[in-house]
Amino acid sequence: MVFFLLILLAVAVAGARPCGPGEFNTDYLDKKNTTAVNGIFVVLVLFSHYVQYADFEGPFDMPYLTLRQHLGQMVVATFLFYSGYGMMEAIRRKGDGYVRKILSKFWQLLFRFDLAVLLYLAVNQILDIHFPLREVLLAFTTWTVIGNSNWYITAVLILYVIMYISFRICLSG
């Protein structure tokens, strides 16, 4: 696994160039740069999920397992930060019009999540794995899980609600 990490590192720095003397990158949080950084973390998230299903006991796997242990679920922190920053910039530029759209973002995300839950239910049905009705219904709200990991979706949905309520109060007053 450490070889995959080295390849990822090489790809990540391949196009990088240091700023010259007296130069400052004012676009460090623009969409192009943040997408590149998020790409690195997408791969780390995929590696992290892959480790749950494969055996990694070789000597070349230990550096990655140590890194994974230290990073934990923080590999998604960049997504939360950049999303929040992007939403704040959109609110700064578009104001109340954008704030009103946050609820539709909430419902779109929940709908997509529920489609994934349906897929899990179908696979579990095929595998003859059954869950109580209450647990299934709560899984559609992200309150419980039926084999899927939902903590990130729950966090994003809650942050959407907090942001919507906060800005509705701030912009109306």
Predicted regions and their residues:
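Membrane-cytosol interface segments of multi-pass membrane proteins
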Residues: 1-173
